[in-house]
């Protein structure tokens, strides 16, 4: 069983000064308010109510931390970080300013952050705000993995087109950098449970979870007799 299934709520942060003073790796989840971010986190962790999904898009304007650790372990081995959804028009100007500052400062300056899972609706990838998030994060030199959510809403050919175009945009970003990080993408559907294992492997690798390490094959050489 994936250690992600053991994820538990840890804390909510509304100011950078309140970020946990920890040293373990973190994986952040970002996306527009209607991209299915909370639902995807819940299904990756095989839980129904881990990440809260507000009935009003854009309502959640703080950062939620979830620990990843074996049962009864004294300390976490990593954190999943649910960032505020962005792009909802009805959020007030002052709240939006604070919220965007919190987002940009966290993704640009958090040294514990190992990678960014960026969720985009497969029907509308790379909106202006999605591009802004990528451009905030790229200078860190850390990887981005795009989940094209709600893939069940598209035909097979439209999904293939969306994935191809997304990978091209990522390749264009990489071409502008001297030493680009890994910029990858996949199709994802919480409803159809599509792409879950692929996304779990990415997150587990970034958190250096034991499940991400290849199994060590036993030696075929018999033990040398002692004495």
From Swiss-Prot:
HAMAP family reported in the protein's UniProt record: GTPase_EngB (MF_00321)
Residue ranges of every copy of the EngB-type G domain listed in the record: 23-209
Lineage: Bacteria, Pseudomonadati, Pseudomonadota, Betaproteobacteria, Burkholderiales
UniProt GO BP: division septum assembly
Function recorded in the entry: Necessary for normal cell division and for the maintenance of normal septation.
One GO CC term, this protein: cytosol
Protein name: Probable GTP-binding protein EngB
Cofactor(s) annotated in UniProt: Mg(2+)
Annotated positions binding Mg(2+): 38, 60
Binding site for GTP: 31-38, 58-62, 82-85, 149-152, 185-190
Family: Belongs to the TRAFAC class TrmE-Era-EngA-EngB-Septin-like GTPase superfamily. EngB GTPase family.
Gene Ontology molecular function terms on file: GTP binding; metal ion binding
Record Gene3D superfamilies: P-loop containing nucleotide triphosphate hydrolases
Keywords, in A-Z order: Cell cycle, Cell division, GTP-binding, Magnesium, Metal-binding, Nucleotide-binding, Septation
Superkingdom of source: Bacteria
């Amino acid at each position: 069983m994936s250690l992600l299934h053991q994820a538990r709520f840890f804390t909510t942060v509304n100011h950078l000064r309140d970020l946990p003073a920890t040293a373990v790796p973190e994986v952040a989840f970002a996306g527009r308010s209607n991209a299915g971010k909370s639902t995807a986190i819940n299904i990756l962790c095989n839980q129904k109510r881990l990440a809260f999904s507000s009935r009003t898009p854009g309502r959640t304007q703080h950062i939620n931390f979830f620990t990843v650790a074996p049962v009864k372990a004294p300390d976490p081995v990593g954190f999943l970080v649910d960032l505020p959804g962005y792009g909802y028009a009805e959020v007030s100007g002052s709240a939006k300013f604070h919220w965007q500052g919190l987002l940009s400062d966290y993704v640009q300056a958090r040294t514990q952050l190992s990678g960014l899972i960026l969720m985009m609706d497969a029907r509308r990838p790379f909106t202006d705000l999605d591009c802004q998030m990528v451009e905030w994060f790229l200078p860190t030199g850390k990887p981005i993995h795009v989940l094209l959510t709600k893939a069940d809403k598209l035909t097979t050919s439209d999904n293939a087109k969306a994935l191809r175009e997304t990978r091209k945009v990522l390749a264009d970003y990489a071409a502008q950098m001297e030493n680009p990080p890994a910029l990858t993408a996949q199709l994802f559907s919480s409803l159809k449970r599509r792409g879950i294992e692929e996304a779990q492997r990415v997150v587990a690798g970034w958190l250096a979870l034991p499940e991400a390490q290849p199994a060590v094959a036993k030696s075929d050489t018999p033990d040398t007799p002692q004495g």
